[in-house]
Amino acid sequence: KLFSKPLRALCVQCFSEMRQSGITTVGEFHYFHHDKETDFAMDRAVLEAASEVGIRIVLLHAFYKHGGFGKQLGGGQLRFSTQDLETWWKHIDQLSVEVDGSMQRVGTVAHSVRAVDIETIRDIAIGSLQRGMPMHIHLEEQRQEIEKCIQAHGVTPMALLNDGIEVSPMVTAVHCTHTAAADMEQWLALGGNVCLCPLTEANLADGVSNMHRIVKQGGCVSLGSDSNARISMLEEMRWMEYAQRLTREERGVCVDNFGSMANYLIDVATKNGARCLGLPVGEISIGKLADFTVVDIEHSQLSGATPETLGDMLCCGADNAVIVRTIISGN
């Protein structure tokens, strides 16, 4: 069992590593729940850790009800169990009032179509939109989930969401490793976001998402560190592109309208991440919060960089060693 005190210590370590790697905001996909509905110990452990480290956080509180399509929870899943939807919303609304609004927000998670029925996912999407909260959901990370969803519902998980909930720029599908082209096209056209986690997806041998079609359609895709086995935003950025090179046998898949890989990947790690978490960050401009990362341009890994080549050298050849510090809310 994992209790609040060791959870807090683990979060402090994790969030500290995030800041050291240049990450200024964490969207914590949080589904360790509590002994009773009035117990906020696990939530507070995560929030207190973020406060101690000084990282901005959106606590994405997960609803988790089933152990699979038509199955009860069992074993280790029992700790993730959510009570009824009404109690869950009361918990979230109370937590939203208690958090430090300058650095902390609350969002929602419907864990997956296998852990939450589509009617409940629809209600969560509606409630999140009404509250101005971002909503995330695991989707099509592994082929088995798709096959079982088709057996249960006759359609893929993405098709189930496209037709079953109100998709908006406040809704993010995490992974989409094996999403069909037509389903992805509809999701992006409806305004939905995608979050990829290249290092975790590689670690778990999940597969590689088709970024080519997402880029071609101009979809909003962000990056997550997921399992945190290795925390490096520069590596996540790099492998978003490199994985495509390996599968498509071509370079420059993840590029902007001007053919720049660096500009595209930097936007993915900043502006797009901000949109997926519903935060006014991600760029240095009037009206945005002063969150940014300082890079040592004289580091040996960036030796010889010019204004024109710095971005590419950062994305292709640098690691956490070039990160000097992170500035969050000007501090």
For the regions a language model picked out, list residue spans one by one:
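His/Asp/Glu-enriched, well-ordered alpha-helical/loop segment
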Residues: 163-166, 212-301, 317
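C-terminal cap of metal-dependent C-N hydrolases
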Residues: 289-331
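Glycine-enriched alpha-helix->loop->beta-strand junction motifs that scaffold or abut catalytic
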Residues: 127-134, 166-169, 186-195, 216-221, ...
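Divalent metal-coordination and catalytic microenvironments
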Residues: 22, 50, 108, 138, ...
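Metal-coordinating catalytic core of metallo-dependent amide/deamination hydrolases
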Residues: 35-180
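Catalytic beta/alpha-barrel core
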Residues: 170-180, 196-202, 224
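Histidine/acidic-residue-rich catalytic or RNA/ligand-binding cores of hydrolases
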Residues: 69, 143-155, 183-188, 205-214, ...
